[in-house]
């Protein structure tokens, strides 16, 4: 298992930039390095607002939309979850399912799971339980269509 200190600085910055603003206090008190990085990241966060998929107790975090942004595929799909958009949402989800393999992020209560694309062939998943000061981070080394990890 990789430690946060073993990851490249760019990847750590990318992961920490995806942490919700409400959770930044916990990040800053975790260690001195994270504190320094989070201060640097928070300055640029306004420009990055919304570039994540966050799930918390069956509700979608911030602005109640899903944003799929994978630069090397040039895909950007925004789905509004209001009642008037249910049909459009179903169509968009069909399009997403046909383009991507399903990835289930199962979270309980107010836990948060964040999916990030990093570089051209890496994905990072950050899991943060509601209670406690623990973050789990999984990073792929290469994205393969037939590769499955548990």
UniProtKB/Swiss-Prot annotation:
Protein name according to UniProt: Putative F-box protein At2g33655
Superkingdom in the source lineage: Eukaryota
Organism, as annotated: Arabidopsis thaliana
Domain (F-box): residue spans on this chain: 1-47
SUPFAM superfamilies linked: F-box domain
């Amino acid at each position: 298992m990789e430690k946060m200190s073993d990851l490249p600085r760019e990847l750590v910055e990318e992961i920490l930039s995806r942490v919700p603003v409400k959770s930044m206090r916990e990040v800053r008190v975790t260690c001195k390095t994270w504190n320094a990085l989070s201060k640097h990241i928070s300055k640029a966060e306004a420009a990055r607002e919304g570039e994540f998929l966050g799930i918390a107790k069956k509700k979608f975090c911030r602005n109640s939309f899903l944003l799929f942004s994978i630069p090397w595929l040039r895909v950007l799909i925004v789905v509004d979850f209001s009642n008037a958009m249910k049909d459009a949402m179903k169509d968009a989800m069909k399009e997403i399912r046909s383009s991507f393999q399903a990835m289930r992020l199962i979270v309980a209560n107010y836990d948060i799971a964040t999916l990030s694309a990093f570089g051209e062939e890496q994905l990072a998943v950050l899991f943060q339980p509601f209670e406690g000061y623990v973050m789990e981070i999984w990073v792929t080394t290469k994205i393969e269509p037939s590769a499955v990890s548990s």
